[in-house]
Amino acid sequence: MITNPIQVSIFNAVADALPFGLDKSKVDVVEATAYSPSPIAIHDYAVGIMAAYGGVVEHLGTQRGLPDQTMSLNRRHCGLALNSGQMHFLNGYGTLMDTWPIGPDNGTYRTADDRYATMIGLHPHLRDKLLGFLDCANSAAAIGRSVQKRSSSELEEGAAAAGLALGIVRSPDEWLDHPQGAATAQRPMVELRSRGSGGTRRLREAFRRPLDGVRVVELTHLIAGPTIGKLLSEQGADVIKVQPPMGDWVLPLWLDVSWGKRNIALDIKSKSGMARLAALLADADVLVSSQRPEALARLGLDLDGLSRVNPDLIFTQVSCYIPDSPWAARRGFEQIAQSVTGVMHAHSEDLPAPTVVSVLLNDYLTGYLGAIGTIAALSAREQAGGFWTVVASLTKCAATSLSTLRPADSEPYAPASTQDLIDFAIDQASPSGVFTRLAPTVAFSHTPSYVRRATNWPGTSPDTVDWEADDAESDVPHVPSVLARNGAIRNLVPCYGIEDRGDGGGGLSLASPLLMKLVQESRQF
């Protein structure tokens, strides 16, 4: 049973948002050493949410005829999973060996009113637009000079009007006093709503795993949304990820969260592309989207449009800000969510300047919350039928994490190491080679979590691909990491996480400083 008070409180907060109860007596937690130093109890926060994920998976499984199950989690494993991209290797070499994330357009800078603002350029089109807004060159010095000419509110509002991702570093109290923070505080950790009952689609009795036969269309990008699809696939769902033929893939992150999916390229702005998407949706159980609502509405895929295509659909939406709120249409990323909600402020109180936490706290855990809501909605649909909506947001996840604050030095920390891969990693073969990655965080007593398809590249499957037969199955295709045990992981850098810094001079990266140093030293030219 979960006994840690923080883990219990988060588990209960998630359970309170669901239409049925969760039994924490079925969950066992191994209390292991943390690796991400912070006054926010990151590992315990992760355990509470991940245990709730295990609970809803078990609930739906028993509803579909599978036996009752117990679940086990390891506290350290749960925290490491919030940086799973750093623990991802192909033939022994890290897939995050890429210097793209370190541009000065991703960083935190001091403003004219002596505050800080965090900005994310990340993709080329956003970077160019951001530099145009700032009217400066793409260097930390130039961006810093431009930012120091404007007040924090001028920057935040101007960036929002321009469709850019930028947020003031607020304290937790400032966030709660802000209209957006107040609106967020009133909402549950994950939201489920029914838009009509009845319907005809129900799931058959499960063959082997809780989500056998569940069909999922994914219209997502980066981490939070794709994590939902990955988690559903680990429990047996058939996931088809739809991407535009051209775009910003951020390949290291793509590989981390594309396990278990068939990836197709589809131009849904074209008549033929939309027809193909509609055909997939008509026979789907779930649509997972991280697209902004107005973008979907322009394509005729607002709630009314989706319900016409499929009146039994579960529409899961993940975003930075909750829908129907003052900032619902604004862009946001992990670091922006940390900045505006007070997470960066709370994490940095004993540091010389605002610094984000060393894991992608909100990206991955919002993915878990979205998966929890999706599975809960599938369960509710079995009883009432109909069209359901599920909402999870980065800022709700971030703000809730502040309930776990305690002194940062209240426990010891140990850096990530090869021993972690020996303890928690698996090897899985693919056409590209052998991937080593962290195993699923929740171990079930009867139904193992696994994916039959290794991660693959954008557009690997043809756009004519169709849903699989319900009984498609195979043996567990992964094994505890042989490469790690044999010392064949070549470039794991011991570190305490991503170690992003926003120190008033820019410099946010998805890699630790030690990893980036290794990248530079290993260049051949």
Q: Which residues make up each language-model segment?
A:
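Acyl-CoA thioester-binding alpha/beta core of soluble enzymes
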Residues: 1-246, 282-283, 307-322, 346-347, ...
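Redox-cofactor binding/interface segments in oxidoreductases and associated redox assembly factors
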Residues: 218, 289, 317, 338, ...
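Rossmann-fold NAD(P)-binding glycine/threonine-rich loop
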Residues: 301, 305-310, 319-335, 342
